[in-house]
């Protein structure tokens, strides 16, 4: 079981991802924006961050970059899950330090498999 911080502003996506992750045996901490998410990461030291890109305030790209520049959090894998489906968006997310990039809506089995690969 891994502790995962979910940074997602959509209540629907929060509910779906939380259900999938808890069903897979993971503990989920949810933040509605990047600033709160970064605080959760610093306070709880998760094994993984699941991050949207389009968020109020700081974007998921900016938050991913911030996590990777901070000595205390730079080793934590980040999976970006976003509606931004262009190859340039994916490449940019990976350049910011994301471990993986998935387009919404992801398939449950694939998302859980990618998470489990990074946290085991």
What is each residue range found by the language model?
Residues 106-116:
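C-terminal output helix
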Residues 44-50, 55:
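Active-site beta3 strand of CheY-like receiver
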Residues 56, 74, 86, 104:
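The feature encodes the CheY-like receiver
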Residues 8:
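Conserved acidic carboxylate
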